[in-house]
């Protein structure tokens, strides 16, 4: 019989942590101060307004070197996180099934999972710096960018506080998408031409991530009715709301960026 303990043991056997993954467990700190994400998000939004006002009458900075380094570091970080977390989530999925990955908390006490969970949360604060490059280089700042950055920080902190197992999928999928996305940003900043389909692929993966996340939320709600799923109705509500808004916004961005221009070009040619 497959149990949460058996699955946890299997994960611990297959995934021995590296030395750096055995660093001090920062979870108690982030769990206690999770609400700090609200003032951080608010300061972020205020700084956006201040920054845009400051740059209004100024010429945009080049920042090519810093942007390459910034994107490269986040790409490497995301690739490492994706490799480790996809390996663990894949093992739990194949060993115990989907319900084990979204309902039972045993596997999240694995040292590797603990490490990549708290550094993932920390990275959501660091990634707010993406917006600084947009503002200082005087590039268009669209709604989906700052909405996504600010709400993901708060949502991740909230889920972290509640130790929600389903959050493992959010972390894992986000690492995977960001591994590709920041690699693309690195190439673009370095004036290396990536494949033309890569931006469309990244947006497609973001849409898929939100769709899968919404499905996971629905399944978590269903399994919770059997009193067999570690979550709260509050977390379920907000996760579903955010996944759906992200899905709609990314789908709209996809249509505006990749579909409408082709339709207009085709119409003009006729």
UniProtKB/Swiss-Prot annotation:
One of its GO terms (molecular function) is fatty acid elongase activity. Keywords: Endoplasmic reticulum, Fatty acid biosynthesis, Fatty acid metabolism, Glycoprotein, Lipid biosynthesis, Lipid metabolism, Membrane, Transferase, Transmembrane, Transmembrane helix. The chain crosses the membrane at residues 29-49, 63-83, 115-135, 140-160, 164-184, 198-218, 235-255. One of its GO terms (biological process) is alpha-linolenic acid metabolic process. It is an enzyme of class 2 (transferase). It holds the Pfam family ELO. It is found in: Endoplasmic reticulum membrane. One of its GO terms (cellular component) is endoplasmic reticulum. Glycans are attached at residues 6, 110. It comes from the Eukaryota. It is a multi-pass membrane protein. Interacts with TECR. Belongs to the ELO family. ELOVL3 subfamily. This is Very long chain fatty acid elongase 3. It comes from Homo sapiens.
């Amino acid at each position: 019989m497959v149990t949460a303990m058996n699955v946890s043991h299997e994960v611990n056997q297959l995934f021995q942590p590296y030395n750096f993954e055995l660093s001090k467990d920062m979870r108690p700190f982030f769990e206690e101060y999770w609400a700090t994400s609200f003032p951080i998000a608010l300061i972020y939004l205020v700084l956006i307004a201040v920054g845009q006002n400051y740059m209004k009458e100024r010429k945009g900075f080049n920042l090519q070197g810093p942007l390459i380094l910034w994107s490269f570091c986040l790409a490497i970080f995301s690739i490492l996180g994706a490799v480790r977390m996809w390996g663990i989530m894949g093992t739990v999925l194949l060993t115990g099934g989907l319900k084990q990955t979204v309902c039972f908390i045993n596997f999240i006490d694995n040292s590797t999972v603990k490490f990549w969970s708290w550094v993932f949360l920390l990275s959501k604060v660091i990634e707010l710096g993406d917006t600084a490059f947009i503002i200082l280089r005087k590039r268009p700042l669209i709604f989906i960018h700052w909405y996504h950055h600010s709400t993901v920080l708060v949502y991740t902190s909230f889920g972290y506080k509640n130790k929600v197992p389903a959050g493992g999928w959010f972390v894992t999928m986000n690492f995977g998408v960001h591994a590709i996305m920041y690699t693309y940003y690195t190439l673009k900043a370095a004036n290396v031409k990536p494949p033309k389909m890569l931006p469309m692929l990244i947006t497609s993966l973001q849409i898929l991530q939100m769709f899968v996340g919404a499905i996971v939320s629905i399944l978590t709600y269903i399994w919770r009715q059997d009193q067999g799923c570690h979550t709260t109705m509050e977390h379920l509500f907000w996760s579903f709301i955010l996944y759906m808004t992200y899905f709609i916004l990314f789908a709209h961005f996809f249509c505006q960026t990749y579909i409408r221009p082709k339709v207009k070009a085709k119409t003009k040619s006729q």
